[in-house]
């Protein structure tokens, strides 16, 4: 038996130098967050680093002083040679590129801001929301609106994820909330070579706890980019979606406990280097059908990455509005994923809650054990979705 790690990255949206650097910074953030999210033998990981970084990018636009520097360092912009004044233009270029992207796959990314109706935003922050992010502005009453305010936000998320995520928030929000910065992303891709449903059969999947489970497993003769790396103890296959601009890249460790070891040691540079070495060939692929649904409160995990000041009483978001001491109370993130014979469907939504401070030879590639995954655009290299499956 071999432990599997599947890295899926769903997108890369960069044409200019700053965008290339933003992609590098976002991919570093993706791997860092993967390292810091807790797992167990019976739980899985799935998140959209792209969704999280865009939502917090809006917070960066309104942050000032040490709070802005905290986000700047936490997202690794200096390590990627991005100047402070280049960050927002890089996001603006990403947004324009994303909306103009033509593909055989469906990729919808939406940005929004739910704002308390009595809050007067600075014109400079409104300009950033409109011009850099193309955000939808949702006016709500967080103080008296109760469930009505939640319904507005959940309705927006439901529409933008095509019904895959119904509830970002389950009930009425605190009355001290003044705005919620939102991102929603939806992906649907058809395999370049669709798996024949008639060949799907029950096969054992070795869970991380070493308990096998019979799961529906697809089988197909597929042309993929593939290579084995014996010295690293990993087998990699990149399964393309129709149009070849998106792919699911699967890293399959040779050891049954290899997923955790691989997760601890993978870097964005290593992933990129390994993918570059893959060679196209026909492979007999065995891939389980599976669904994932996850929800995270990211405050503690972001703090581990050095992003602290946005949450404290000393947070400085004076670039958003005058006359209110604002701080982030938490970052809510939800994702869903379904992998089946026809392809993949995934969605993610993020809400940054800001409150008024008081808080060739045919090869067999058998995916039959725990794995980590990214979905990515093969041209742009941005990581949009990351996950780790330990239990089916």
Curated annotation (Swiss-Prot):
GO terms for cellular component: extracellular space. Keywords: Glycoprotein, Protease inhibitor, Secreted, Serine protease inhibitor, Signal. Transmembrane segments: none annotated. InterPro entries: Serpin_CS (IPR023795), Serpin_dom (IPR023796), Serpin_fam (IPR000215), Serpin_sf (IPR036186), Serpin_sf_1 (IPR042178), Serpin_sf_2 (IPR042185). It is found in: Secreted. PROSITE patterns: SERPIN (PS00284). Pfam families: Serpin (PF00079). Glycans are attached at residues 104, 130, 265. GO terms for molecular function: serine-type endopeptidase inhibitor activity. It comes from the Eukaryota. Its main location: secreted. Female salivary gland. Residues 1-16 form the signal peptide. Belongs to the serpin family. Serpin with unknown function. Weakly inhibits human granzyme B (GZMB). Acts as a substrate for porcine elastase. This is Iripin-4. It comes from Ixodes ricinus (Common tick). The lineage of its organism: Eukaryota, Metazoa, Ecdysozoa, Arthropoda, Chelicerata.
């Amino acid at each position: 038996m071999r432990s599997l790690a599947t890295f899926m990255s769903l997108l890369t949206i960069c044409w200019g130098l700053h965008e290339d650097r933003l992609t590098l910074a976002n991919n570093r953030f993706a791997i860092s967050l993967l390292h810091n999210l807790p797992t167990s033998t019976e739980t899985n990981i799935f998140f959209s680093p792209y969704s999280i970084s865009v939502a917090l990018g809006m917070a960066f636009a309104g942050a000032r002083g040490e709070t802005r520097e905290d986000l700047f360092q936490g997202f690794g912009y200096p390590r990627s040679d991005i100047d402070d004044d280049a960050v927002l233009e890089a996001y603006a270029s990403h947004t324009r590129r994303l909306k103009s992207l033509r593909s055989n796959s469906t990729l919808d990314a939406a940005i929004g801001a739910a704002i308390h109706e009595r809050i007067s935003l600075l014109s400079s922050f409104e300009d950033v929301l409109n011009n850099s992010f193309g955000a939808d502005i949702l006016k709500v009453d967080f103080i008296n609106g109760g469930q009505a305010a939640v319904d507005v936000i959940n309705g927006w998320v439901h529409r933008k994820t095509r019904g895959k995520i119904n509830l970002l928030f389950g009930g009425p929000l605190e009355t001290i909330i003044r705005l919620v910065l939102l991102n929603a992303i939806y992906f649907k891709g058809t395999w370049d070579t669709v798996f024949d449903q008639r060949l799907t059969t029950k096969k054992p999947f070795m869970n991380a706890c070493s308990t096998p489970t019979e799961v529906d497993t697809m089988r197909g003769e597929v042309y993929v980019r593939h290579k084995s790396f014996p010295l690293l103890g990993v087998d990699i296959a990149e399964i393309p979606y129709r149009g070849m601009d998106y792919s699911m890249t699967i890293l399959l460790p040779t050891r049954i406990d290899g997923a955790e070891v691989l997760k601890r040691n993978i870097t964005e540079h290593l992933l990129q280097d390994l993918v570059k070495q893959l060679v196209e060939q026909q492979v007999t692929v065995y891939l389980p059908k599976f669904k994932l649904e996850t929800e995270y409160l990211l405050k503690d995990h972001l703090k581990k990455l050095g992003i602290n000041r946005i949450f404290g009483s000393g947070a400085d978001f004076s670039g958003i509005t005058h006359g209110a001491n604002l701080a982030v109370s938490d970052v809510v993130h939800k994702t869903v994923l379904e992998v089946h014979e026809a392809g993949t469907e995934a969605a993610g939504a993020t809400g940054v809650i800001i409150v008024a401070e008081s808080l060739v030879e045919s090869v067999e590639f058998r995916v039959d054990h725990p794995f980590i995954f990214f979905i990515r655009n093969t041209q742009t290299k941005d990581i949009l979705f990351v996950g780790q499956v330990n239990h089916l």
